[in-house]
């Protein structure tokens, strides 16, 4: 017999963007919630206040264009779902062109006040030093990239030594459709067929000696981002920034990630490439490819300019640029089920940046979903996942299984934090993109814009349907 009443509280650990949003969604569903936040008792190296949802870096939530920008689409979906984070951001907006930027102090104060004022939310200022106790039958861990060492250790003990990363090492990701396949070709090194492979699992970009030397020079001269004082220098074996490798010797890269051995240019088989940049499929949809071994601390502008020097990537569009940061996150594709529940511990969910999403709104959106899922579970309702065609659903799908983990590197390095982008969405149905009347040539940028507009329109329509279905369930419960 179930002795847990429908009014037993759900516990949320962490009062950042994800935790605050999760608590709000739970309380908005009529379920009490206890929000545990350690700041006020113990600080972090990055936070300056004890306010909820403090923004420690930029004050920008990025593009607010819901017609053709994936970030704008997730903004719109979160607003439709009654997001506290988006409501506070809209209330505290400051001028920023097409972006949604906020007064950071006012934003945190607005979130803090809303959470404290909600009658179903209790805020407890304390450090949770281990995994939530089992008598917290439903709980969400949303402790973010600066998770306290004691809790991180407990998570690692529960999930396994290789399941938790403490720094991300992000290589750029390129939209497949922007790669010039008249220059590049598909081939695995030595035509090796790995598990699930075909022997043609990589896209290869060839360089001659002059191109290689110019590329190395650009890497060495490129502007880089320094580590924060509290981050230290987390270089570890097999994960050096590409520009650091270039500085260690002109030939280092062509004997490392850019080695040409075992590869034959399908367009020019008799000419041996001096160096080769490889891109590996990053998601199950096959829309995104990551640049193998290209983790970097180069500034974003420098990355785009330098990486477009690579033959075949002259017109590359990047879904994500590279980076190396202090960041605690779990290997979500192997550890979490589709409702963000830890497979080894029913009732315990993870949310926010610790799940391997990247960005303010992405973190908050995962908190939104975790909160809704936990509330539904508490009320005995079937958990309704957002459709894969929505921004929420596409991000959820990537975190909980859409990323392809390879056997060639440890899982925690293979799975790296991801922001929302159109490469995570399912493709449109064939024939969806129709050339406008009166237009003679319809390709390139114009076609891409229409494609993204159609994906955005589909996402918002499907999200509205999903939320309407949830409302019907709630009303009939």
From Swiss-Prot:
Pfam families: GIDA (PF01134). It is found in: Cytoplasm. FAD binds at residues 14-19. Its EC number is 2.1.1.74. One of its GO terms (biological process) is tRNA wobble uridine modification. Signal peptide: none annotated. HAMAP family: TrmFO (MF_01037). This is Methylenetetrahydrofolate--tRNA-(uracil-5-)-methyltransferase TrmFO. It comes from Rhizobium johnstonii (strain DSM 114642 / LMG 32736 / 3841). The lineage of its organism: Bacteria, Pseudomonadati, Pseudomonadota, Alphaproteobacteria, Hyphomicrobiales. The gene is trmFO.
């Amino acid at each position: 017999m179930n002795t847990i009443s429908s009014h037993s509280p759900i516990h949320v650990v962490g009062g950042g963007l994800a935790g605050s949003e999760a608590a709000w969604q739970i309380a908005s569903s009529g379920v009490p919630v206890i929000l545990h936040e350690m700041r006020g008792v113990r600080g972090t190296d990055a936070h300056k206040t004890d306010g909820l949802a403090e923004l420690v870096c930029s004050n920008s939530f990025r593009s607010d264009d819901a017609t053709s920008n994936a970030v704008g689409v997730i903004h719109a979906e979160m607003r439709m779902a009654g997001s506290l984070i988006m409501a506070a951001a809209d209330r505290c907006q400051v001028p920023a062109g097409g972006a949604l930027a906020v007064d950071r102090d006012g934003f945190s104060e607005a979130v803090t006040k809303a959470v404290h004022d909600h009658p179903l939310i209790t805020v407890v200022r304390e450090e949770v030093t281990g995994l939530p106790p089992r008598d917290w039958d439903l709980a969400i861990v949303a402790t973010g990239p600066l998770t306290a060492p004691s809790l991180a250790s407990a998570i690692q003990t529960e999930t396994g030594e290789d399941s938790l990363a403490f720094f991300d090492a992000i290589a750029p990701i390129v939209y497949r459709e922007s790669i010039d396949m008249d220059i590049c070709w598909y081939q695995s090194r030595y035509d090796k067929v790995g598990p699930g492979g075909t022997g043609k699992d990589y896209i290869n970009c060839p360089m001659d000696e002059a191109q290689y030397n110019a590329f190395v020079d650009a890497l060495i001269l490129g502007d880089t981002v320094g580590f924060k004082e509290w981050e230290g220098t987390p270089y570890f074996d097999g994960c050096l920034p590409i520009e650091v490798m270039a500085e260690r010797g002109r030939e280092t890269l062509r004997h490392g990630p850019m080695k040409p051995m075992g590869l034959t240019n399908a367009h020019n088989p008799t000419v041996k490439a001096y160096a080769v940049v490889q891109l590996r499929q990053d998601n199950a949809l096959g829309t995104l490819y990551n640049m193998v071994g290209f983790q970097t601390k180069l500034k974003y502008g420098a990355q785009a300019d330098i990486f477009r020097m690579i033959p075949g990537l002259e017109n590359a569009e990047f879904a994500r640029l590279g980076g190396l940061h202090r960041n605690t996150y779990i290997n979500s594709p192997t550890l979490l089920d589709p409702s963000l529940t830890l497979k080894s511990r029913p009732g315990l969910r993870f949310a926010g940046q610790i799940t391997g999403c990247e960005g303010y709104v992405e973190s908050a959106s995962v908190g939104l979903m975790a909160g809704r899922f936990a509330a539904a579970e508490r009320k005995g309702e079937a958990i309704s996942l957002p459709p894969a065609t929505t921004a929420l659903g596409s991000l959820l799908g990537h975190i909980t299984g859409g990323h392809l983990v390879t056997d060639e590197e440890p899982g925690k390095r293979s799975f790296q934090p991801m922001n929302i982008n159109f490469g995570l969405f399912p493709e449109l149905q064939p024939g969806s993109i129709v050339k406008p009347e009166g237009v003679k040539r319809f390709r390139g940028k114009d076609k891409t814009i229409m494609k993204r507009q159609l994906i955005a329109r589909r996402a918002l329509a499907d999200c509205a349907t999903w939320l309407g279905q949830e409302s019907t369930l709630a009303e009939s419960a």
